[in-house]
C-alpha cells in the first residue's frame, strides 16, 4: 500500500501494524526534558501517532501542535488528552500544512516519521521543516532505523544523508549522540540529532 496515502497508515493502526508505537513517551525525549537542555516554546510534532511525546512536551509547558496522517491516530490523541495539558491536534498530510504556519515553530520533533516517508520525498520533507521553523529554530530527530536495509517502511536512515540535507540548507548540527536511554530493542540503531536553522541567510 502507498506510504503517501492515509489509508496505509490507517490500516496499520486498525490491524495492529503500529509497531513503532512504544506505548509511552520516548525515554530519550523524556531525558531531554528532565535535564533542562531545552527551553519551552512552540513545538510541532510530526507523525505524532497516539501523541505520547506530544503530551509529554505539553506537560512540560511547550505549546504543542501534533500532526498525523491517520484519522485513527488523531482520534486516539483526542481520547488520550490530559486535562489541563492543551495541545492542538491536526489530522492531515504534513506535506499540506498551510503556509500560515511558516516560521511558526521554535522546534520540530521527529521520531519514526522520516523513516516512514517515501525516500524520494526526503528533500521535500527537509524543505518543509525549513519552512515551518522560525529562524534559529531547532529540528530534533531521533533518527531511526540506522541500517542499510532495502525497502520499507521503515526505510533505512543514514546520518550522512541527514547531515547533507540539512547542511545544504544552512542548518548547523548542534547535538549528536547515541543515547543510552534508547529502548533496548532500538539501542544502537538510533541517534539523537539536533539541527539549528540559521537566523539569517
Describe the function of each predicted region.
Residues 106:
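Conserved acidic residues
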Residues 1-45, 49-101, 117-201:
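Class I (Rossmann-like) S-adenosyl-L-methionine-dependent methyltransferase catalytic domain
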Residues 109:
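A conserved beta-strand element that flanks and buttresses the S-adenosyl-L-methionine
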Residues 112, 116:
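Short catalytic micro-motifs in class I SAM-dependent methyltransferases
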Amino acid at each position: 500500500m502507498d506510504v503517501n496515502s492515509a489509508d496505509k497508515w490507517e490500516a496499520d493502526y486498525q490491524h495492529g501494524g503500529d509497531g513503532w508505537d512504544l506505548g509511552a513517551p520516548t525515554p530519550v525525549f523524556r531525558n531531554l526534558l528532565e535535564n533542562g537542555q531545552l527551553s519551552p516554546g512552540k513545538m510541532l510534532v510530526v507523525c505524532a501517532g497516539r501523541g505520547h511525546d506530544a503530551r509529554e512536551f505539553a506537560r512540560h509547558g511547550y505549546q504543542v501542535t501534533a500532526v498525523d496522517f491517520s484519522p485513527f491516530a488523531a482520534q486516539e490523541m483526542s481520547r488520550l488528552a490530559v486535562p489541563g495539558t492543551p495541545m492542538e491536534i491536526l489530522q492531515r498530510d504534513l506535506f499540506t500544512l498551510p503556509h500560515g504556519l511558516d516560521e511558526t515553530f521554535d522546534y520540530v520533533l521527529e521520531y519514526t516519521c522520516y523513516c516512514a516517508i517515501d525516500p524520494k520525498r526526503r528533500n521535500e520533507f527537509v524543505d518543509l521543516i525549513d519552512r515551518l521553523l522560525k529562524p534559529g529554530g531547532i529540528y530534533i530527530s531521533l533518527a531511526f532505523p540506522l541500517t542499510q536495509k532495502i525497502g520499507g517502511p521503515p526505510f533505512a536512515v543514514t546520518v550522512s544523508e541527514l547531515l547533507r540535507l540539512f547542511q545544504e540548507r544552512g542548518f548547523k548540527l548542534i547535538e549528536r549522540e547515541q543515547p543510552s536511554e534508547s529502548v533496548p530493542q532500538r539501542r544502537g540503531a538510533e541517534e539523537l540529532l539536533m539541527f539549528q536553522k540559521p537566523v539569517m541567510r
